[in-house]
Structures are given as structure tokens and as C-alpha cells.
Amino acid sequence: MAQTALNIVILAAGKGTRMYSKMPKVLHRIGGLPMVERVIDTAAALNPQNICVVIGHGKDQVLDTVKRDVVWVEQTEQLGTGHAVKTALPHLAAEGRTLVLYGDVPLIDTSTLETLLEAAGSEVGLLTDVPADPTGLGRIIRDSQGSVTAIVEEKDADATQKAVREINTGILVLPNAKLENWLGSLSSNNAQGEYYLTDLIAKAVADGIKVHPVQVRASHLAAGVNNKLQLAELERIFQTEQAQELLKAGVTLRDPARFDLRGLLKHGQDVVIDVNVVLEGDIEIGDNVEIGANCVIKNAKIGANSKIAPFSHLEDCEVGQNNQIGPYARLRPKARLADDVHVGNFVEIKNASIGKGTKANHLTYIGDAEVGSKTNFGAGTIIANYDGVNKHKTVIGDEVRIGSNCVLVAPVTLGNKVTTGAGSAITRNVEDNKLALARARQTVIEGWVRPEKGDKK
């Protein structure tokens, strides 16, 4: 095996007691993605020989949630970071090197890791930081020449060592040829009663192997998550970085501090996004699109020159060019809108294709339907697509005029240029160019007197 072969071990077995959650800590999300999944993606970008993820607490939840091509290794007892890496040993190459990452350090990036790997070479690499407050973190101990000699955990540190501000981030590069021997010689004789991975630094020094420290360029890149406050802080840093990149690329964000991107955004020119917009999953937005305040959009494609008015929700849908959506509109999965479509307030569309120029401006439900072009839905139109057991399809042709407060009971077909009278319940097919009326005849009672409160029976 070539000396440069790279294995990566991601430690993700911890319970995360301070998260106060039944969910394993590493499944809590940053930018819409579980933390451990984000770390796996970063690791994969380094093109390693393999990636081993050590899991323990909540392993079934982790396996059910994270679908990545990695080697899963179970740590049945949580006996420390050194013990965790030891469980992965059977899956590591005899030669080369191993990079140790953490499933609760979600913002580590490939650039930092590449710098660390280059500095380490075939020896030991250590990522360090100098935070404003090092309390609770392992200190980097150096000799008089400035060489790293050990890492001392705060619970085991004396007053002099606690005064050191440079800390261990936990991210290490280790030579595989030495790893098994070093891990096998670890002791749990410390304040925690655990096998510390950090003790390998002293073992490397004792074996004459140089330790190459690399200071991270920004503390948040190596920051771990132990509670919901830290999770929220890293989420805001992540979102700020996303917003900055979009602004540099020409997207207008009315308030970058009130914008969330929880996925991937592909955008055209002159896109404008108002406050409190949440974008999730894979989003594609064309030129000159405007998204109003308080919209939530997930896995959607929006064509050029379309306007999404405030408080609209779009999910797993396609919107053509020059559309007007909302306010308070909802496009559910498999809604497919052609160009020049208007969908107004309190209109819901699900599993339906809508033809060019069609309008449903208010208070309408369109489900499991195929709708032609230039059709108009009057206010209060409902497609009754469910019989209590099965969903049924409705087909509506071109230039249909559906009166207000109509119910179309599926399965039913309306031909081209059909008109339905307001208040009709349409249960049978209607041929082209026909008028359909299906409502009770109005009756006016002459001489009727409305009862008033207090009238005696």
C-alpha cells in the first residue's frame, strides 16, 4: 500500500447528553443536513481510500437517516476517543495515514484538511486553535523550541498548563504503521477514566516522530457542538457564509441576516429574495425571479420572471416562466405549472399539471388533475379527488370557465371551452363548448317572518 493512501475515521458514537434530545447528537442539523452527513461529504471530497464512521448511541437512527457509501463501525462501549479509533482499526490500511474527524464538528472544510495533510506528510498532523476562551479544552504543550510535546486535557492539567490558550481541536493525521501499537498502549488512568486519542501525541514524540501543528484559520471551522446554543451559533455562521456567497454572486437579499439556505441553490441573474425566506433541498431559480417575504420553498424549479408573493409554500414542484404565485399559495409535490400561470391567495395545487395562461386566483383546490391552457377557476372551486379509499383524476381542457363555488367530483372530464355555472357540483363528463349547471333551484318563500329572540313558541 502506498504511503500516501488516506483513510478517514469519523467519530460519531457519543450520546450528546447536553443536547437534551432523544436524537443522537450527530443527527442534529446544520444548514438542513445532519452534522455527521456534512462531515462525511467533506471527507469524501478528499478522495480517501475509505471512510469509517464509528457509531454507538442511537446507531439505528443514524443508519436509518444517513445514506452514504461509508464503512459503519459500532463502538459498543463509549470508552473514549482512543477506544473509538481502535474499533475502526480492522478497516484501515496497514500503511498510509489516517485522518480523524468528528461527527459533531460540522463546519470543517476541505481546504483546512488539505493544509493539515500537506503539513503532516507521513508523520503526525495536529489541527490547533487559539480561541477567546479555552475553558474545558485540551491544551497544546510545547517545549522550549516550540515543538509540540503533548496534549493535556483540562481536567488533568495543572495551573501552568491551564494558562495555555492554544487548544487541541481533536482533528489529527496519524501514520497507520504506528497506529495499532500506539492505540494498544493507551491507558485510561486519567480523570475521565477513558482512553484519550490525544495521548498519541506524546507517544509520537517518544518514538521520534515529528508532530506538525496547523492552526485553523477561523475557530468556527473546528468548533464542536455540545448543546443547542452551540448548534444555533454554528447554524448562524453557516447561514451568514451562504448569504455572503449569494450576495457576491449577484443575488439581492433584502436582509442577509433573515435568510436561510438549507440545501443547494442554482440561480440566474437579478434574483431578489425578501426577508425570512427559507430555501430547502435542491432549488433552481431563473432570471428576474422575485421571492416575497416569509416564503418556504423546497426542491423547486422556478422559471424566469416569476413572482412568488409573501407567505407562499412550494414543495417538489415546477413553476414556469412569468408566473404569479401567492400570496398565501401552496404548491405541493408534483405540481407542474406552465408559463404565464396565476395562482392566487389560498390556492392549493397537488399532483397536477396546469397549462399556459391558466388562472386560479383565490380559494381553490386542484388535486390529481390535468388542466389545459387559458382556463379560469372561479373562487371557491374544489376538485373532490378522493372517495375515501382511492384518489381519482380530473381532466380539464383549454379555455374552460369554472364558476365560483363549484365542486368537480373526480373522476371527471371537462372538454375545451366548457363553462360551469356557479355553485355547481359536476359529477359527469362535459363535452366541448357546453354549459353545465348542477345546483338546486332557488326558492323564495313569500310572507315568511324571521323569528326574533324572545319570541314565545
Question: Can you describe what each PLM-predicted range is?
Answer:
Residues 1-7, 33-118:
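Conserved N-terminal catalytic core of the sugar/cofactor nucleotidyltransferase
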Residues 1-21:
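N-terminal nucleotide-binding beta1-loop-alpha1 segment
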Residues 30, 101, 436:
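Catalytic metal- and UDP-sugar-binding loop of GT-A-like glycosyltransferases, i.e.
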Residues 60, 68, 108-191:
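Conserved core of the sugar-phosphate nucleotidyltransferase
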Residues 148-239, 244:
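Catalytic-core segments of class I nucleotidyltransferases/pyrophosphorylases
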Residues 168-172, 263, 392, 410:
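Glycine/small-residue-rich pyrophosphate-binding loop that anchors the diphosphate of NDP-sugar donors
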Residues 206-313, 322-324:
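Extended, small-residue-rich solenoid/repeat segments and analogous flexible loops
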Residues 307-457:
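Glycine-rich hexapeptide-repeat left-handed beta-helix
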